Structures are given as C-alpha cells and as structure tokens.
Amino acid sequence: MDIRLDSRRAIQAGPLVTTGRIAGAALRMARPFLGIARRLQFKAKAFELALRSVALQLMNDAMADADEAMEETEEDADALGGPRQEVRAVSDGTIVTEREMTCPQNRYCHECSWTGAAAGQNVAAKGAGAAVPGPNRRTGSGERRGYG
C-alpha cells in the first residue's frame, strides 16, 4: 500500500476539503438553476410592477367614475330643485336619506317618521322624546355612531 497516495487522499478528503468539494459540486450543479432563478426573479419583479400599474390604473378609473356619478347626482338634485340629500344604504338594505340620518334619536330607521321641521310632533306623538331639528347633536353632522 502506498502511503503517499493514501495520505494525499486523506489530506484532500479532510472534513473542510470534503465540505468544500461538496459545496463546490453543489454550486456547479446549481449554477444553471441560479441563472434561471435570477431571470425568473427579474421577471417576477417586472410582473409585480406591471400588476401594481394595472391595479393603480383600475383604482384611478374607479375613482373617476365615482366622482362623475356624484356630480351627475348633484346635477340631478339641482335640476329637480329640491335640497340635496345624501342617500345611503344601511346594512339591512333600507335606503336612508341625509334628513333621516340627522334624526335626533340617531337612528337609521323610519320608526319616528323624522321629517325635519315636523319631527318634533312626530317624535313626541310616538312618545320617543323631544326632537331637536337640524344636524345630529351628538356627532355634529349627519353621520351616525351606532344603530340607535
């Protein structure tokens, strides 16, 4: 048995060298895949940017459509000559106008027949208490805080 050959192999096959060889072989085998991964990563980034661009464009279009619809609604209200009333849908499906939203009872309902100036009599007649005409006194606007 030739000691040189065995010792050379033993030296070359030491733990660090073996690890280095394995790592080198793994890198050599993975090199084509790393190139593909880099190209795919670049393509994924470009795809992500394209998706963001499309999403941003869709959002801008939707905002423009919403603004246009609001302007048309305001023009229709002006053409009818009536006061502008913001109309909103409540979670149970009923439609409530701004006047109903400013009910002093802070309710999104038709219980008290809130009709602005005549609301005091309507609310008192139903025994719900005195009404305060005008905007909602609790929130300072027509916005609601709860379901009342």
Swiss-Prot record:
Residues 66-93, 124-148 are annotated as: Disordered. Induction: By plant 4',7-dihydroxy-isoflavone or derivatives. Involved in efficiency of soybean nodulation and in nodulation delay. Residues 124-136 have a biased composition (Low complexity). It comes from the Bacteria. Keywords: Nodulation. Signal peptide: none annotated. The gene is nolJ. This is Nodulation protein NolJ. Residues 66-78 have a biased composition (Acidic residues). The keyword Transit peptide does not apply. Coiled coil: none annotated. It comes from Rhizobium fredii.
